[in-house]
Amino acid sequence: MISSQEAFEEIKRGAVEIIHEDELLSRLAEEKPLRIKLGFDPTAPDIHLGHTVVLNKLRQFQTLGHEVIFLIGDFTAMIGDPTGKNITRQPLTREIVMENTKTYETQAFRILDPDKTQVTSNSTWINKLKADDLVRLAATYTVARMLERDDFNKRYLSQQPIAIHEFLYPLLQGYDSVALKADVELGGTDQKFNLLVGRELQKHFGQRPQCVLTVPLLEGLDGIQKMSKSLNNYIGITEPPEEMFGKVMSISDELMWRYYELLSFRPMREINRWREEVSEGRNPRDIKILLAEELVTRFHSKEAATKAHQHFIDRFKRHELPTDLDEIELTAENTHLTIGYILQRAGLVNTTSEGLRMIAQGAVRIDGERVEDIKLAIPRGESHLFQVGKRRFAKVKVI
């Protein structure tokens, strides 16, 4: 059994903010199971890797012996979370919400232990609230406090409409914490306001206020906007293994480290060691393959990951990469050769500077994988297929 301090350090990994750290540490020191709440509104039928960042954190609490509550916001989904929106969301029908709800529990159990997870829906208690209950609940918060929210404030200042029911959303989400007597609530950084409303309402109802733990929002495949099905930059956890593997391999080398930090269960010391090796010349593609294999194994199986890896290799050989090239041997005086030098000596570009320029333009690939690092070095003993543009190829071995 680990100490409360060790448990706290494990919980803290990957968290953006804990409100308040001393409160959480004190509660962990009580050595009693805490009630950990995580809510999801079933606004779409599928869970993607972005959702799993906070689900992994919930699983962490579960592994430490705490009571985890997977709350399906079937009522609040019909309101629509206004967080980050510059217009009023169209409310979903109950039929759509219930259809989406069917898949959420099954998908969540790919991460959570079903035997140790309490699943509940907030319609259970919200549907029982009467009109006077809602009026009293609304009286606990002022319009001025609501307008402290960045999204509401921007809409107010730009004279964009804010519907009254949107003000109810954070109040009802906060009331969920009262109904569940939550000790800790988890959420993305964009949910901070809503989570803090839960703290305030618990105080109002005479409960010990929950601690709040926020986790980062995972960037989508584009590396810019947060992962979202509506932006088509997502990886769904129920996608076929080959598709999941290929999507992971398509992310940039820099984004790969972000995915390792937020999605991988590997120790940070191991990830940091790989990062150092890449900075010294190791091909980041090799590290990315390990990430793809880990994620496919988690959501499918080890066998599926092996097949997906082979499918990925075969696809590039079949559709993009020639296999009948004579191998060119280039001698490294030290332990490696730089990418610019290899491209120039292999006849793929006229000068080293042209090679670096082509890398910056995204026109250089190694074994079908786009190169982004102009300082990439290939160690002695490795053989790869280099590509510039669509038609220039060379098979090179560094000796």
UniProtKB/Swiss-Prot annotation:
Residues binding ATP: 229
SUPFAM superfamilies reported in the protein's UniProt record: Alpha-L RNA-binding motif, Nucleotidylyl transferase
Domain S4 RNA-binding: 337-398
GO CC annotation, single: cytosol
Entry keyword set: Aminoacyl-tRNA synthetase, ATP-binding, Cytoplasm, Ligase, Nucleotide-binding, Protein biosynthesis, RNA-binding
GO biological process: tRNA aminoacylation; tyrosyl-tRNA aminoacylation
Primary location: cytoplasm
Family label: Belongs to the class-I aminoacyl-tRNA synthetase family. TyrS type 2 subfamily.
Protein name: Tyrosine--tRNA ligase
Biological source species: Coxiella burnetii (strain RSA 493 / Nine Mile phase I)
Species lineage: Bacteria, Pseudomonadati, Pseudomonadota, Gammaproteobacteria, Legionellales
